[in-house]
Amino acid sequence: MMFTFGKPLNFQRWLDDHSDLLRPPVGNQQVWQDSDFIVTVVGGPNFRTDFHDDPMEEFFYQFKGNAYLNIMDRGQMDRVELKEGDIFLLPPHLRHSPQRPEAGSRCLVIERQRPKGMLDGFEWYCLSCNGLVYRVDVQLNSIVTDLPPLFDIFYGNVGLRKCPQCGQVHPGKAAIEAVARGDQP
């Protein structure tokens, strides 16, 4: 019998074998490549300033530690808590920013591969007025390899970080460092 993705794997062994990739600076690893699903394990601590606009549903299983999703919905910021053992199915196009403040926390995230032409959006919002500061759309193939260059472009360009509504400059990477220290950005 031929199994496209191999025989069943022991998930705990896989986690142990990839533990060095599940903490900063990498923080995540895809379990299988070239499947219809993007199956990723994300480890904490991990903070993000972007909001993901996924055109498809995302499944979260917070199997170790706690995390939360910052949600931007119709100009209002909200928060969805993910406690250890929780599962959550995020609807398509709900802007979300996963935050994993606990070292050693682990979340299994399952997404569908996007058909050609179906783009994911990544957005940054003003910390003063909640206005949209910047958005980029991309054909997403791998969150592990596709996202860092997008973030580097935003963080490296002060002009992209200036809010068109109130003029406030998004702190960029400094916001991540502030949150990691326990400060407000």
Curated annotation (Swiss-Prot):
Substrate binds at residues 58, 100, 111. CDD domains: cupin_HAO. Pathway: Cofactor biosynthesis; NAD(+) biosynthesis; quinolinate from L-kynurenine: step 3/3. The keyword Transmembrane does not apply. Its cofactor is Fe(2+). Binds 2 Fe(2+) ions per subunit. This is 3-hydroxyanthranilate 3,4-dioxygenase. It comes from Pseudomonas fluorescens.
